[in-house]
């Protein structure tokens, strides 16, 4: 019989017993056992949020000097990070599914751009002439730009280039790569049929027949699957459910052709894509389904190559005005990545004349027309697709440290500036959930929050200085303390200071100190009604000496404190048969003492 595995709460308790409050290890054996059990335990995101084990393990990793323990803790934290990030990506994909506009039967048909509705179908002869044009050898782009693009592609999370294929596989016409239905939407079986599946390339005749067959199928898509909007000439239509990388590049080029201005002659297709692009496309379609924007179904398109050859103006636009700008930028990796693949020198791509080189430029005006520069869109797309990618295993995440002076001025000598670390995940104490950090920029020194805190701190310091400079004797604090306006102001100031966490003492601090002193002096000035304290007697008749007749006369005829009665501070005499009423605190409270002797 094996013991039941410990719950995350029990593991957390064991870890807390093995470390001190500063995360220093007191019991190394127990910490190693906790790490081992956590490595085997299939923990969930909810358990991590409840127990805050990630923070505890990270603190232990920072404090420990055991390198092996630090490595194991880091590996464990990385695995948890991958566990949390895909959950957020899955939620984004589900939101995209909920807001999508599909067909009447729930989107069971395959998602294709409606090529037949936008223009007349091309004849086989026309396709053949285009085919011949595509076989022309193009120019190769410079190595410097390709290196830059390769770096961008690696940042976007794509795996490296695939192994080289023979020149026989560089046929310009590529049939449909089999799409990956990541969201459960079933595709039509005829679109999956491809003669490339077995051999990796196909003859031109089979490709032309298959294109013609696909053009016939393209007229069967329901009308309500694609709803064009007419709000602006270039960007006014919503994104279609299936935006594929190559299709989106061609749509961008067509959009630039359709914008008002001097008309561009429609030339031959700009780029020829080899079968290796379809492999890139498969991996990219898998990632695109994770980062699909709200309102689009992340389903891969089964026939992007039909758009490559026919160059028909597609009704599918690039961006939807109703989507927020950040989400709109998430489409941009699909617009840039095919160009990156074309520019790789290892991939033996041939470009169809100068048309492809000229075709790279219209993407940038399109971005600037949307209100974003290409550099910022590249940075946003890098950030959007950084999580959950395969390249994490190759490229380790190195957090950047930013040095920020919160006062916005030159730091004084001997004062350390605050160091802020950029993190990918953060714990929200309000919702008690672990969330990806949305703010990727360093906190600026001129941000309004810090300016507000800075001004509030300066006000508190000035107030403290003013109150220190004016002594108590110059102000009638007693009258001020009774004023309702002053009291409300002081209470509000006190709550503000406590909420902002400032340690500077304000006027309320000195007021309370003064009131305490006044209270103590007032208590001293009150008349206390108590018994007169008696010093211990030195002359004790009957103990230190013999009892005499004078002692007996004194007991009977005169007042002898402590012997035949007692006296209070107001001069009243009480014998042992009387009740004594006193006010020991000076607050008008009465203390009644019963008689010492009862003569009933």
UniProtKB/Swiss-Prot annotation:
Keyword Nucleus applies: yes
Biased composition, class Basic and acidic residues, residue ranges: 123-133, 207-218, 441-461
Top-rank lineage group of the source organism: Eukaryota
Statement: the UniProt record of this protein carries the keyword GTP-binding: no
Protein's GO biological process: positive regulation of gene expression; positive regulation of transcription elongation by RNA polymerase II; positive regulation of transcription initiation by RNA polymerase II; regulation of transcription by RNA polymerase II; RNA polymerase II preinitiation complex assembly; transcription initiation at RNA polymerase II promoter
Biased composition (Pro residues): 314-324
Region (Disordered): 99-330, 348-402, 431-461
Keywords assigned by UniProt, alphabetized: Activator, Nucleus, Phosphoprotein, Transcription, Transcription regulation
Domain TFIIS N-terminal: 10-87
A GO molecular function held by the record: transcription coactivator activity
Protein family (similarity comment): Belongs to the Mediator complex subunit 26 family.
Quaternary structure, from the entry: Component of the Mediator complex, which is composed of MED1, MED4, MED6, MED7, MED8, MED9, MED10, MED11, MED12, MED13, MED13L, MED14, MED15, MED16, MED17, MED18, MED19, MED20, MED21, MED22, MED23, MED24, MED25, MED26, MED27, MED29, MED30, MED31, CCNC, CDK8 and CDC2L6/CDK11. The MED12, MED13, CCNC and CDK8 subunits form a distinct module termed the CDK8 module. Mediator containing the CDK8 module is less active than Mediator lacking this module in supporting transcriptional activation.
Function: Component of the Mediator complex, a coactivator involved in the regulated transcription of nearly all RNA polymerase II-dependent genes. Mediator functions as a bridge to convey information from gene-specific regulatory proteins to the basal RNA polymerase II transcription machinery. Mediator is recruited to promoters by direct interactions with regulatory proteins and serves as a scaffold for the assembly of a functional pre-initiation complex with RNA polymerase II and the general transcription factors.
Listed name of the protein: Mediator of RNA polymerase II transcription subunit 26
């Amino acid at each position: 019989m094996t013991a039941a595995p410990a719950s995350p709460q029990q593991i957390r308790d064991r870890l807390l017993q093995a470390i001190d409050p500063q995360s220093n290890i007191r019991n190394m054996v127990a910490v190693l056992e906790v790490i081992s059990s956590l490595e085997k335990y299939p923990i969930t995101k909810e358990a991590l949020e409840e127990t805050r084990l990630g923070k505890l393990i990270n603190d232990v990793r920072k404090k420990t000097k055991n390198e092996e323990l630090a490595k194991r803790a880091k590996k464990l934290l990385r695995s948890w990070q991958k566990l949390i990030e895909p959950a957020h990506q899955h939620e984004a994909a589900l939101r995209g599914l909920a807001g999508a506009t599909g067909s009447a039967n729930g989107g069971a048909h395959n998602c294709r751009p409606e090529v037949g509705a936008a223009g007349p179908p091309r004849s086989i002869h026309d396709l053949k002439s285009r085919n011949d044009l595509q076989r022309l050898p193009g120019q190769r782009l410079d190595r410097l730009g390709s290196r830059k693009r390769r770096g961008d592609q690696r940042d976007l999370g794509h795996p490296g280039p695939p192994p080289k294929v023979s020149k026989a596989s560089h046929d310009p016409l590529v049939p449909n790569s089999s799409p990956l239905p990541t969201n459960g939407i079933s595709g039509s079986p005829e679109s999956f049929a491809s003669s490339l599946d077995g051999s990796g390339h196909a003859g031109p005749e089979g490709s032309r027949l298959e294109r013609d067959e696909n053009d016939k199928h393209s007229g069967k898509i329901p009308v309500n699957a694609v709803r064009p909007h007419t709000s602006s000439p270039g960007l006014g239509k919503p994104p279609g459910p299936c935006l594929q990388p190559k299709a989106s590049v061609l749509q961008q080029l067509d959009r630039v052709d359709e914008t008002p201005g001097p008309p561009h002659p429609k030339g031959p297709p700009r780029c020829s894509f080899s079968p290796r692009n379809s492999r890139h496309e498969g991996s990219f379609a898998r990632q695109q389904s994770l980062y699909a924007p709200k309102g689009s179904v992340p389903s891969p398109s089964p026939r992007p190559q039909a758009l490559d050859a026919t160059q028909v103006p597609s009704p599918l636009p690039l961006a939807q005005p109703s989507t927020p700008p950040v989400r709109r930028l998430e489409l941009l990796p699909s617009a840039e990545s095919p160009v990156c693949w074309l520019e790789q020198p290892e991939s033996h791509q041939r470009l169809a004349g100068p048309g492809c080189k000229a075709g790279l430029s219209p993407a940038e005006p399109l971005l600037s027309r949307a209100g974003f520069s290409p550099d910022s869109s590249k940075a946003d797309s890098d950030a959007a697709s950084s999580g959950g990618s395969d390249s994490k295993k190759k490229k380790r995440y190195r957090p950047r440290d930013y040095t920020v002076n919160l006062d916005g001025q030159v730091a004084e000598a001997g004062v350390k500036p605050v160091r802020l670390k950029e993190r990918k995940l953060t714990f929200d104490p309000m919702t008690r959930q672990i969330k990806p950090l949305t703010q990727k920029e360093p906190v600026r020194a001129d941000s309004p929050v810090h300016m507000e805190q800075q001004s509030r701190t300066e006000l508190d310091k000035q107030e403290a200085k003013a109150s220190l400079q004016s002594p108590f004797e110059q102000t009638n604090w007693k009258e001020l303390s009774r004023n309702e306006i002053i009291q409300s102001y002081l209470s509000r100031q006190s709550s503000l200071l406590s909420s902002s966490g400032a340690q500077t003492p304000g006027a309320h601090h000195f007021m309370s100190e003064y009131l305490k002193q006044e209270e103590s002096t007032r208590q001293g000035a009150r008349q206390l009604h108590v018994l007169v304290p008696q010093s211990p007697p030195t002359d004790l008749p009957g103990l230190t000496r013999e009892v005499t007749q004078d002692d007996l006369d004194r007991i009977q005829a005169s007042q002898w404190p402590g012997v035949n009665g007692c006296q209070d501070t107001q001069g009243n005499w009480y014998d042992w048969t009387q009740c004594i009423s006193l006010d020991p605190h000076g607050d008008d409270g009465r203390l009644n003492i019963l008689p010492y002797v009862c003569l009933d």
